[in-house]
């Protein structure tokens, strides 16, 4: 048996990003999806904390899924009842988020079933996969990471989330 040679990432190299994020700052439409809002907040938070808080407040008032996504990510009292790891699902093929069948903006009402035991496990998992297949590809990739407690946004932390949504339990 041959031994594996250590040809992984070189020492000192940056960690591999958890997912590909938007890196260009742009003006968001009024009906922006959660992924776009959090990517822009991530960019702005690196420059100015207060502007990021105001942006999250502004878009969080229009899209209820922003607050619930951040709460699921940062609240220690919320534990996912879904299996850990990458979910096997078929990625939505629509090129733009506004062409997808649905969005987290509408599907966030189902989050309560993924963190409680109200629904049998098989039904809960099928609901999760159906939701991931219906929402835009980047949103489904993001929420699949959030389910496991992995923060894909390096500049968004619990301090920023609480500043934007003071009634959030973190």
Give names to the regions the model predicted.
Residues 2-170:
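N-terminal nucleic-acid-engaging modules of covalent nucleotidyltransferase systems
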């Amino acid at each position: 048996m041959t031994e594996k040679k250590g040809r992984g990432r070189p020492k000192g190299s940056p960690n591999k990003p958890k997912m590909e994020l938007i890196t260009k700052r742009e003006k968001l439409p009024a009906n922006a999806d959660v992924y776009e809002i959090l990517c822009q907040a991530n960019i702005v938070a690196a420059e100015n904390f207060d502007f990021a808080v105001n942006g999250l407040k502004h878009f969080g008032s229009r899209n209820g899924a922003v607050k619930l996504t951040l709460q699921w990510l940062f609240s220690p009292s919320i534990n996912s009842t879904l299996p850990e790891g990458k979910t096997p699902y078929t990625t939505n093929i629509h090129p733009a988020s506004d062409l997808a069948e649905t969005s987290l903006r509408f599907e966030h009402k189902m989050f309560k079933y993924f963190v409680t035991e109200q629904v049998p496990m098989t039904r809960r998992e099928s609901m999760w996969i159906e939701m991931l297949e219906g929402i835009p590809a980047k949103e489904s990739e993001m929420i699949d990471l959030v389910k496991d407690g992995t923060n894909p946004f390096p500049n968004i932390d619990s301090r920023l989330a609480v500043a934007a949504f003071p009634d959030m339990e973190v």
